[in-house]
A protein has these predicted regions:
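Face-selective signature of the C-terminal outer-membrane beta-barrel domain
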Residues: 19-33, 73-79, 83-243, 266, ...
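Conserved C-terminal beta-signal and adjacent last beta-strands/turns
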Residues: 17-21, 33, 215, 275, ...
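Gram-negative outer-membrane beta-barrel transporters
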Residues: 220-221, 225, 324-326, 349-439, ...
Length: 500
């Protein structure tokens, strides 16, 4: 039995629009979600279930816990947390009000006020006196359930709060061949974390200002070029630790100007070319300062894109696109086991150079008024190079560069066959993921098919049937070093019937 896998999701959304004329309106929206999720977060590894319950899988940090690749069955610890009744929650409350006061040649001008509230919590049972946290002897789930009936120790709840209040402004103006957009955003961001079991807490806040200016120049009927600038400024972070002392990291204040340029040229009615370049810059967020024990650098680099669109006859179209991303610094946190810490893990700052090449080819063809087919191919090649260390610092000798660069399928193919007739429509989509490194995936390739059927009863009502993963393929598109291969499978075969 998968104890602890229950979940509950509640949500509500309200939107009110008041249109004054074709170009002016006021819009109010509020979104609310409340999610409660039990464990486990990964499926059981049945190969090592007996090993886990006989106490051979060490998940206790005090005794030097190890993860999946060098401690088979480690991910079963999350099933154990499900048995104990641990859970996570998330609540979001997002509000915004938008006033569009002008629209000039499809260039909107508006003011938007927003407020976001995100609250997260992790609840862990406080007292692991039975079966002493690490299963030993021949512990059974039933024995643990019996013990829980008499447990009165409660849960240790860690909480995380994210807040952002701000204002967006955009002004659009057409002047001859110039289509100008100017915008800016001011916000105050706040993050708070409380971990009672580790007796730590932190509050981090920051003021941010971003602005952009772009001009789409239409030169004749066939050529357009769009230069643009983006400016970002953020104040020093104010970090308040558990003792109440305020700290402003000396490198946290940021001012940066970046540029972009895009162009499109129409050779004739059937062929057009396009290209773009943009500088990438992302300043450290409030959560970046709290997520790692090591310093992170701002993220920066360049992205280039080139492509063509071609009509072949009256029924076929071709789209080819190539992009290249070159990051001088890509940031992130990388967590590994460290028995010397209270939690048994340590987060390392992952400042790395990154290059990413992607090729996308798509062909759409309509056979007649009823049948159509879309075929696409995507190739992605990513290479990370960590700057501060080359192997995972856990003694396993694993290459960090390989680990980061080979965690997604390299090739993907999609075949989308569609049928439309009167009130009935159908789509049969098959996706093939290949080029998977079997050090990180359970198979070199995965084939997944989905089917969608739709029938329109009236102009406002339709019924539908959706079938996902028709072949019930066991597949995954993610790898996480802690848990080992196959720890994040995608959903199996399922069907959904509904009315719109």
């Amino acid at each position: 039995i998968y104890y602890g896998t229950k979940y509950k999701d509640d949500s509500a959304a309200v939107r009110i629009d008041r249109n004054f004329d074709r170009d002016r309106f006021v819009s109010f929206s509020f979104n609310y979600t409340n999610n409660w999720d039990g464990y486990p977060v990964v499926p059981r590894d049945y190969r090592y279930a007996d090993r886990f319950f006989s106490g051979q899988v060490n998940i206790d940090s005090a005794a030097g816990k190890k993860h999946g690749p060098i401690n088979p069955g480690f991910r079963n610890k999350w099933w154990y947390h499900g048995v104990l009744g641990d859970y996570t929650t998330s609540i979001t409350r997002n509000l915004d009000v938008t006033w569009q006061f002008k629209k000039d040649h499809d260039l909107p001008s508006y003011v938007r006020i927003f407020r976001t509230r995100n609250d997260y919590s992790d609840a862990w049972i406080k007292n692991y006196t039975y079966p002493n946290y690490t299963p030993s002897g021949n512990v059974t789930p039933a024995q643990i359930q019996d013990w829980l009936k008499t447990y009165t120790g409660g849960f240790s709840v860690s909480s995380y709060q994210e807040r952002s209040n701000g204002l967006d402004f955009q002004f659009g103006k057409n002047i001859g061949i110039n289509n100008i957009l100017f915008g800016m955003t001011v916000s105050h961001d706040y993050y708070r974390r409380v971990n009672p079991s580790a007796r730590t807490r932190a509050s981090i806040s920051r003021n941010m200002f971003t602005s952009y200016l772009q001009d789409k120049l239409k030169i004749g009927d066939n050529f357009e070029i769009t230069p643009g600038l983006r400016y970002i400024h953020s104040d020093d972070y104010t970090v308040k630790n558990g003792g109440g002392k305020d700290i402003s990291p000396s490198d946290s204040s940021v001012s940066h100007l970046s540029g972009m340029l895009s162009t499109r040229y129409k050779l004739d009615d059937t062929l057009s070319l396009y290209a773009s370049w943009a500088q990438v810059f992302r300043a450290k967020r409030v959560t970046d300062y709290d997520a790692t024990l090591e310093p992170l650098d701002d993220e920066k680099g360049n992205v280039y894109n080139i492509g063509l669109k071609k009509k072949i006859g009256s029924r076929t179209s071709l789209d080819i696109n190539f992009s290249y991303l070159k990051m001088d610094n890509a940031i992130g946190a990388y967590s590994v086991e460290d028995a010397s810490t209270a939690t048994g893990t340590k987060s390392y700052a992952m400042n790395a150079s990154q290059s990413k090449r992607a090729l996308n080819i798509g062909i759409d063809h309509r056979f007649n008024e009823n049948w159509r087919l879309g075929i696409s191919y995507s190739y992605v090649k990513t290479h990370y190079h960590a700057k501060h260390f080359t192997t995972v610092p856990d003694g396993s000798g694993t290459s960090l560069d390989d680990l980061l660069s080979k965690q997604i399928p390299m090739n993907s193919y999609q075949f989308d066959l569609g049928y439309d007739k009167g009130k009935f429509s159908a789509d049969f989509l098959t996706s093939i993921y290949s080029g998977n490194d079997e050090n990180f995936f359970t198979n070199k390739r995965f084939v997944v098919s989905d089917l969608t059927l739709n029938f329109k009863i009236t102009d406002s009502t339709s019924v539908y049937l959706v079938g996902n993963n028709l072949w019930n393929t066991a597949w995954e598109n993610r790898y996480y070093y802690h848990m080992g291969k196959g720890a994040f499978p995608q959903p199996g075969r399922r069907f959904l019937i509904g009315i719109n």
